[in-house]
Amino acid sequence: MARRGWRRAPLRRGVGSSPRARRLMRPLWLLLAVGVFDWAGASDGGGGEARAMDEEIVSEKQAEESHRQDSANLLIFILLLTLTILTIWLFKHRRARFLHETGLAMIYGLLVGLVLRYGIHVPSDVNNVTLSCEVQSSPTTLLVNVSGKFYEYMLKGEISSHELNNVQDNEMLRKVTFDPEVFFNILLPPIIFYAGYSLKRRHFFRNLGSILAYAFLGTAISCFVIGSIMYGCVTLMKVTGQLAGDFYFTDCLLFGAIVSATDPVTVLAIFHELQVDVELYALLFGESVLNDAVAIVLSSSIVAYQPAGDNSHTFDVTAMFKSIGIFLGIFSGSFAMGAATGVVTALVTKFTKLREFQLLETGLFFLMSWSTFLLAEAWGFTGVVAVLFCGITQAHYTYNNLSTESQHRTKQLFELLNFLAENFIFSYMGLTLFTFQNHVFNPTFVVGAFVAIFLGRAANIYPLSLLLNLGRRSKIGSNFQHMMMFAGLRGAMAFALAIRDTATYARQMMFSTTLLIVFFTVWVFGGGTTAMLSCLHIRVGVDSDQEHLGVPENERRTTKAESAWLFRMWYNFDHNYLKPLLTHSGPPLTTTLPACCGPIARCLTSPQAYENQEQLKDDDSDLILNDGDISLTYGDSTVNTEPATSSAPRRFMGNSSEDALDRELAFGDHELVIRGTRLVLPMDDSEPPLNLLDNTRHGPA
């Protein structure tokens, strides 16, 4: 029995060979696999976290390095402005005859740009540049998948093939090159606004017809003359094989509009220092102010030229008239928007008590003025035109509602901003000659451009002056015409228009050539202004307050009659309705509006208008006097003017009362009583009035 008990059992395949055993072992295998994968994942996650931390450290270092470089770039511009200010101070003591501070600011910019371009190189490890990415188009935004993470890259611009090995240096130079919108949204508004806010309106409106002719007709003539000449140059370049890209007639016209924007800031600064004849100063200043506005609207109209059909560069009559309509619409809309913003600011300052809080008053004035530019641009108009007429409106109405402290603050604030912005732009021009990456210089185009701007300026000044002299009592002399021809400098506006779009080959060539034109005109014409004044025998040292003393009596009366004919309706409307509505002065609206408007008139009339406590302080306005009872008060003395039919005019100081009145209207502050309304008319806030009767002034300048 025992032997059978030790019987040899057959050999088995294994413990889990049975189905039941396999079912029991399956969970064990699953647990083991999960453990292995968890361990591998933990190891992989640790490496990923380490790589992520390394990437964060590298990003922080790059951000810190970029911040330091940006600070250094801004410091460069601050030092340039500081050096320019010190140079101006030096020139106040020792004037360099053939060099103005604006030209020297450009030289400073050139030197700094030269050092940045050729003297400083960025180490290759600062920027990680990959040159193996190839796409068929140039999208504005590029999303790149890097190890499962998506990164956003923005388009900065085209780099020529011969500069691929210097991308690091290009990146450094690109950082000192501002976005063109910075010029239009930050630097141009204070310059243009100050031109309108500080406008000497008496001289401006006296020559308004001539200024409008030079600004509108002259700019259009200059644009088409330059565009036609440049199209001939471009055709010659195509024939000789010098043209490497497309250049159409519309591009030539656009270039003509760009370089037709004159900016004689250097000449006007010298005129102001030497006290050049006020008529010449008014013509040049008025033309430059409106010329900038016309040039920018004209360039926008040319860009908007879109003829029907596939070829957008052929001549089409319908498209031409459409562009003319766009020009008129943009200009008139911008004018209306600028004037409306000034009116709104005047109403706010009149019907609130902000004058009790000068800081808030100045802040509101500043923001409303600057927002005019941005509002016009956002609505598709031109901010330059809007902010110019906003400045004129603010000076005519809002300025009178401000407190005395705010009046000084606003004038000084915008004068400072204008000074810094102008000098910054001139310094930046010199810098851009070396830091801009896509310059295109063509000798034929450059020479043709210089010939074109001289011929365009001549076609503007001389024919229009001949036509204007046919209807002017005070003729524009040949020496004035030669000086206006000589003073056609190009500056900040031409530079800003040219740099705004440099995407195509044609625009790059236009920008590079415009830069050379600005350098040449500022250095040569700006530096030769004093010598040209002497050569043309133009009067200097002329006090604007004394300009009428040497004018014959019959010419003064003729000028007065012409002014009355041109502006009588406007001045009556302005004096009787607009100034009482928008300021604290003038006759109450209850006396000028119809009786049915009594409630509205009482609501809109300021209490000061009834009490005659707040006087109208409209600097540099020109009053048109009609026949009637007019008395001019000098302290305790009063001069009365008689109607034109009076046969026995009173004599005062050896002259007729009308002569005394004409002299006094040309200078200083005085009190004028017209039909019971007291009105202060400060004619020039920059110079004290003549003390003809040893009396003191009645109001502040």
Curated annotation (Swiss-Prot):
Domain of life: Eukaryota
Molecular function terms from GO: identical protein binding; potassium:proton antiporter activity; sodium:proton antiporter activity
Keywords for this protein: Antiport, Cell membrane, Disease variant, Endosome, Epilepsy, Glycoprotein, Intellectual disability, Ion transport, Isopeptide bond, Membrane, Sodium, Sodium transport, Transmembrane, Transmembrane helix, Transport, Ubl conjugation
Effect of L188P: In MRXSCH; reduces oligosaccharide maturation; decreases protein stability; partially accumulated in the ER; impairs acidification of endosomes; reduces localization to recycling endosomes; impairs trafficking to plasma membrane; reduces uptake of recycling endosomal cargo
GO biological process: axon extension; dendrite extension; establishment of cell polarity; monoatomic ion transport; neuron projection morphogenesis; potassium ion transmembrane transport; regulation of intracellular pH; sodium ion import across plasma membrane
Main location: membrane
PTM summary: Ubiquitinated (in vitro). Glycosylated.
The reaction(s) this protein catalyses: Na(+)(in) + H(+)(out) = Na(+)(out) + H(+)(in); K(+)(in) + H(+)(out) = K(+)(out) + H(+)(in)
Membrane topology: Multi-pass membrane protein
Regions that span the bilayer: 71-91, 103-123, 176-196, 211-231, 252-272, 278-298, 324-344, 372-392, 414-434, 436-456, 479-499, 515-535
Sugar attachment sites: N128
Localisation: Endosome membrane; Recycling endosome membrane; Early endosome membrane; Late endosome membrane
Cross-link (Glycyl lysine isopeptide (Lys-Gly) (interchain with G-Cter in ubiquitin)), chain numbering: K475
Keyword Transmembrane helix found: yes
GO CC aspect terms: early endosome membrane; endoplasmic reticulum membrane; intracellular membrane-bounded organelle; late endosome membrane; plasma membrane; recycling endosome; recycling endosome membrane
Biological role stated in the UniProt entry: Endosomal Na(+), K(+)/H(+) antiporter. Mediates the electroneutral exchange of endosomal luminal H(+) for a cytosolic Na(+) or K(+). By facilitating proton efflux, SLC9A6 counteracts the acidity generated by vacuolar (V)-ATPase, thereby limiting luminal acidification. Responsible for alkalizing and maintaining the endosomal pH, and consequently in, e.g., endosome maturation and trafficking of recycling endosomal cargo. Plays a critical role during neurodevelopment by regulating synaptic development and plasticity.
Oligomer and partners: Homodimer. Interacts with RACK1; regulates the distribution of SLC9A6 between endosomes and the plasma membrane.
Family named by the database record: Belongs to the monovalent cation:proton antiporter 1 (CPA1) transporter (TC 2.A.36) family.
Entry's disease: Intellectual developmental disorder, X-linked, syndromic, Christianson type: A syndrome characterized by profound intellectual disability, epilepsy, ataxia, and microcephaly. It shows phenotypic overlap with Angelman syndrome.
Designated name of the protein: Sodium/hydrogen exchanger 6
Record organism: Homo sapiens
Organism ancestry: Eukaryota, Metazoa, Chordata, Craniata, Vertebrata
Gene: SLC9A6
